[in-house]
A protein has these predicted regions:
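N-terminal beta1-alpha1-beta2 module of alpha/beta enzyme domains
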Residues: 1-66
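Flexible, glycine-rich active-site loops centered on histidine and acidic residues
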Residues: 2-17, 79-142, 180, 188
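Conserved, mostly hydrophobic/aromatic
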Residues: 3, 31, 35, 43, ...
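Hydrophobic faces of well-ordered beta-strands that scaffold small-molecule active sites
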Residues: 3-7, 39-41, 71-73, 101-105, ...
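Active-site mouth loops of central-metabolism enzymes
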Residues: 7-22, 76-83, 154-164, 273-282
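Acidic (Asp/Glu)-rich catalytic clusters
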Residues: 32, 59-67, 90, 94-101, ...
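An alpha-helical appendage that flanks or caps ligand/catalytic pockets
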Residues: 123-150, 190-298, 328-331
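A conserved active-site cap/scaffold subdomain adjacent to cofactor or substrate pockets
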Residues: 170, 174-189, 195
Length: 331
């Protein structure tokens, strides 16, 4: 089973967005050397915690600084943009870096509604237009008769992916004949049948003749379970602050996270968000990921790892690669 990376360019307390981007670039090179298959970057707006607001620009830098790992958006939030312009961007990247570009698109705003309206040229949100936008984007990328034709035209088109965390996105991906990435790290309480909905509604397309799905999971891997749980506290507390808008949402130290006293509701939120995370030793994480892939019926696994310390983040991926024997080409 192939293993991939989603990186959100997290900003630690005491750090900066510039530092976060440099760490994302370094992590792409590091995970490529370890044998990971894809490296995707996310889109978020108006947040102190995550630096990536323009994945298409970061993708160009990542592709330039790596050699063969697939580079993608995880994802571009299509309702904010013109599908035609997104197609031009994706084709440009595919011309520069042939056979390496994944274009993951999603419906979620990636921000609050105030910022979502600011992203729109007329101050109106268009999330209800997403299915139509996806259909148009497919035609622009893959239909040679589409007019006006999208230029430049690469020798090999980018791979369009649907991203989502709900049955609606799974069904739409199936109907459009697209590969589907389910964000379990965003919606950990979703029924394991989510990918069945995708498979049942799948209509083969020239790009994707049979269903293909990946599952994105929060992962923290360390030499001991205790250390992995300690490292995971940073993400858990910072995400709680991010979700509630209370406190500094930048990635805090494990020591600060451990000192936070949670209410019963806050603890329940943290526990629920961590229910499908893979946190532990390499063997524990490997077993949890295989178990999740089997339960959901996923073809591929994508991992997202956030720690306060960048070296701990790299170490987590190194241990994971070793557990999956990525360097042997067998996983």
């Amino acid at each position: 089973m192939q293993l991939s990376v989603l990186d959100q360019s997290p900003i630690r307390q005491g750090g900066s967005a510039a530092q976060a981007f440099q760490e994302t670039l370094e992590l792409a090179q590091f995970t490529e050397a370890l044998g990971f298959h894809r490296f995707w970057v996310s889109e978020h707006h108006s947040t102190d915690a995550l630096a990536g607001s323009a994945p298409e620009i970061l993708m160009a830098a990542l592709a330039q600084h790596t050699r063969h790992i697939r580079i993608g958006s995880g994802g571009i939030m299509l309702p904010h943009y013109s599908p035609y312009k997104v197609a031009e961007i994706a084709n440009t990247l595919a011309c520069l870096y042939p056979e390496r570009i994944d274009l993951g698109v999603g419906r979620a705003p990636g921000t609050d509604m105030v910022s979502a309206r600011a992203l729109s040229i007329d101050g109106k949100t268009r999330f209800d237009k997403f299915p139509e936008q996806v259909e148009n984007l497919q035609s622009m990328l893959y239909d040679a008769d589409f007019r006006p034709a999208v230029k430049p035209q690469p020798s090999a088109s980018p791979n369009l992916w649907m991203l989502g965390s709900s049955p609606d996105s799974a069904v739409l991906a199936g109907q459009r004949g697209l590969p589907y990435n389910f964000a379990l790290f965003i919606n950990p309480h979703m029924d394991t049948r989510i990918l069945e909905y995708y498979q049942q509604r799948f209509e083969p397309s020239a790009q994707c003749p049979k269903p293909y799905s990946s599952l994105t999971v929060n992962v923290i891997c360390a030499e001991t379970e205790q250390e992995a749980k300690r490292l995971a506290l940073s993400r858990q507390i910072s995400f709680l602050r991010f979700a509630t808008g209370k406190g500094d949402s930048r990635i805090c130290t494990p020591e600060e996270a451990a000192s936070v006293v949670l209410s019963a509701d806050e603890q329940a939120f943290v526990d629920q968000r961590s229910s499908h995370a893979a946190i532990g030793t390499p063997e524990q994480v490997r077993d949890k990921l295989f178990s999740l892939a089997e339960a959901f019926g996923a073809d591929e696994l994508m991992t997202v790892t956030i720690t306060h310390d960048f070296e701990a983040r790299k170490r987590s991926y190194a241990l994971l690669a070793d557990a999956f024997k990525l360097s042997d080409g067998v996983n």
